[in-house]
């Protein structure tokens, strides 16, 4: 049986090419020099600007909704927005394409609309009257109809498939529903124009006001103070709240109104708990995370790869895209402001086995970690974040990449020694990182070459491999540091650790483990067919086409993870860096020790097996 009439968009298969549907209007505006006030096509420019601002309105509300650092206490549905919902709502703006053509058709059908005055205050009164007398009751009736039988299962069910209401959910509906909504929106404007009081300002004010209220109702954050409705009880029936509309999404048999609960009162569909729940939500309750991954920003471009900037972009692995370039100056200014004033903040969350996991960001960028004068400030930020997590009652804090740099804080040792009474466990996650790298090395490998060999990870990998009788060429100029590591191996295994000081020593070795940056010249020493395993931050650039390059050590989260909707840097969906996964394992296993400082080589296999047992999988 085919799909119901007007239940899917005609341009569903076009992807981003759907925006070509704007081309006739844009082309007409350009050809008619619509930017000139005297142009007969000036109305086209105003129309396109209006719809551009409409799209921006929903985007700004989406950004607000996903600013967990500012809104998490007043979130109504506490779950995160997962990849499934993001994908379903990817084309949320389809209704704008439909409605811009509906509006253009109206302008062509009624040429007098092209010459509206800029402002007429009387039109506002007419539009307000018709909104209350026509749009609100008609929407209420239509909405209730869409909740019955065939109309719900074939049309409105799509809108209600969103587990967590979001501003983009407001636009996520079928063509039939958007045609009805577009017609209802037009009633007040048409009435004002018919009465001779239409204006450009009225069109902008009414349409943008309509969009703001729709986005607000779906934002999943309570924006009204509870005391407002106690002080002015009549407002309860004149304006809905995000909590009020979220109840409709959860119960589906109550709170059908467009913006005015008065019509639910008249229709007998007003949920009695709406205002009590609104009061409770507006008071704000902070949910305590049990696991915190303390990340940092990589660079200015990557700072845009977060849900509160562009949700859909954050749901895909990071890569520099052309549309980001105009945003770079703004992102650079934000970087300066964060450097000056910001503290660690929440960027995203998910749930695993019913427990809340949060990602916090230290407001520092990759280059900051290489500035000597910035060291104390970074450590202070990390320390405050750990103390905050400890005070909240979190169980584990895992340090990302540069936040656990040996030269910065000894892999977290600084904080554990300074605060011996910490209840939260501090974890660098390097034990699992080492395990991931080691398990990537093919069985039967007899020789490897390693840079960064005397680092924390390099030491652990070298000692583990020599126990397996794998010859490890450790690239280091420091004989003292090499010998210190070699002495940690048992006498019968020390022979497998070999110090080398030149890259040419590895010209016949096809397994390179990279813990220190490699230039193109240095990479040329690798023979064809070499695979570069990496634990260097940032990862090296793959210059050799006849070689393969691994990504940073990572693992896939268990299948039962919920509410995960953002990719971790350039990793695939559901995949996190090994240091993140190491913290998760530490939490799930209930380990009571801090994992800081040197890696315990004896625990590498223990942690690896625990990760697999809990459902984490190698990539």
From Swiss-Prot:
Membrane topology, as annotated: Multi-pass membrane protein
Cystine connections: none
Protein EC: 4.1.99.5
Location (main, coarse): endoplasmic reticulum
Tissue localization of expression: Expressed in germinating seeds, embryos, radicals and leaves.
Induction profile: Induced by drought, cold and salt stress.
Family: Belongs to the sterol desaturase family.
Protein name: Very-long-chain aldehyde decarbonylase GL1-1
Annotated source species: Oryza sativa subsp. japonica
Taxonomic path: Eukaryota, Viridiplantae, Streptophyta, Embryophyta, Tracheophyta
């Amino acid at each position: 049986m085919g799909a119901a009439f007007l239940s899917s968009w005609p341009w569903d298969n076009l992807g981003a090419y759907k925006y070509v549907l704007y081309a006739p209007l844009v082309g007409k505006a350009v050809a008619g020099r619509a930017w000139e006030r005297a142009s007969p096509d000036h109305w086209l420019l105003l129309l396109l600007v209006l719809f551009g601002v409409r799209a921006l309105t929903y985007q700004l509300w989406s950004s607000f909704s996903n600013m967990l650092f500012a809104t998490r206490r007043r979130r109504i549905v506490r779950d995160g927005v997962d990849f499934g919902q993001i994908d379903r709502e990817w084309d949320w703006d389809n209704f704008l394409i439909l409605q811009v053509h509906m509006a253009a058709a109206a302008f062509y059908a009624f040429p007098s609309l092209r010459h509206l005055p800029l402002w007429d205050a009387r039109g506002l009164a007419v539009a307000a009257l018709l909104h209350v007398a026509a749009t609100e009751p008609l929407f209420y009736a239509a909405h209730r109809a869409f909740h019955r039988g065939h109309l719900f299962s074939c049309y409105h069910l799509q809108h209600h498939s969103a587990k967590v209401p979001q501003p983009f959910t407001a636009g996520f509906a079928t063509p039939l529903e958007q045609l009805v909504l577009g017609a209802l929106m037009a009633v007040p404007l048409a009435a004002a124009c018919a009465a001779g009081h239409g204006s450009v300002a009225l069109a902008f004010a009414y349409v943008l006001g309509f969009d703001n209220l729709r986005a607000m109702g779906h934002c999943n954050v309570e924006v009204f103070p509870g005391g407002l409705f106690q002080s002015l009880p009549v407002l309860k029936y004149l304006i809905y709240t995000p909590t009020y509309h979220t109840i409709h999404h959860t119960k589906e048999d109550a709170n059908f109104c467009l913006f005015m609960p008065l019509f639910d009162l008249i229709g007998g569909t007003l949920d009695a708990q709406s205002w009590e729940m609104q009061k409770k939500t507006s008071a704000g309750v902070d949910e305590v995370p049990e696991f915190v991954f303390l990340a940092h920003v990589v660079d200015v471009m990557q700072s845009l790869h977060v849900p509160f900037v562009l949700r859909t972009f954050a749901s895909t692995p990071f890569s520099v895209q052309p549309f980001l370039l105009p945003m770079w100056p703004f992102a650079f200014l934000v970087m300066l402001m964060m450097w000056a004033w910001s503290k660690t903040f929440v960027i995203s969350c998910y749930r695993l086995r019913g427990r809340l996991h949060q990602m916090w960001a230290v407001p520092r960028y990759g280059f900051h970690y290489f500035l000597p004068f910035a060291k104390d400030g970074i450590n202070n930020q990390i320390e405050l974040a750990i103390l905050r997590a400890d005070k909240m009652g979190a169980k584990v804090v895992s340090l990302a990449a540069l936040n656990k740099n040996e030269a910065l804080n000894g892999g977290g040792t600084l904080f554990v020694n300074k605060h011996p009474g910490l209840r939260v466990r501090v974890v660098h996650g390097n034990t699992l990182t080492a395990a991931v790298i080691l398990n990537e090395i093919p069985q039967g490998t007899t020789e490897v070459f390693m840079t960064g060999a005397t680092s924390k990870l390099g030491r652990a990998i070298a000692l583990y491999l020599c126990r397996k009788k794998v010859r490890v060429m450790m690239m280091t100029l420091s004989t003292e540091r090499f010998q210190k590591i070699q002495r940690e191996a048992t006498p019968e295994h020390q022979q497998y650790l070999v110090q080398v000081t030149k890259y040419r020593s590895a010209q016949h070795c096809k397994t390179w483990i990279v813990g220190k940056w490699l230039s193109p010249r240095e990479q040329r020493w690798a023979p064809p067919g070499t695979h570069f395993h990496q634990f260097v931050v940032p990862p090296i650039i793959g210059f050799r086409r006849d070689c393969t390059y691994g990504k940073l050590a990572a693992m896939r989260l268990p299948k039962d993870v919920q509410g995960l909707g953002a990719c971790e840097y350039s990793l695939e969906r559901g995949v996190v860096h090994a240091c993140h996964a190491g913290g998760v394992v530490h939490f799930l296993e209930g380990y009571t020790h801090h994992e800081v400082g040197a890696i315990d080589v004896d625990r590498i296999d223990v942690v690896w097996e625990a990760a697999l047992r809990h459902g984490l999988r190698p990539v």
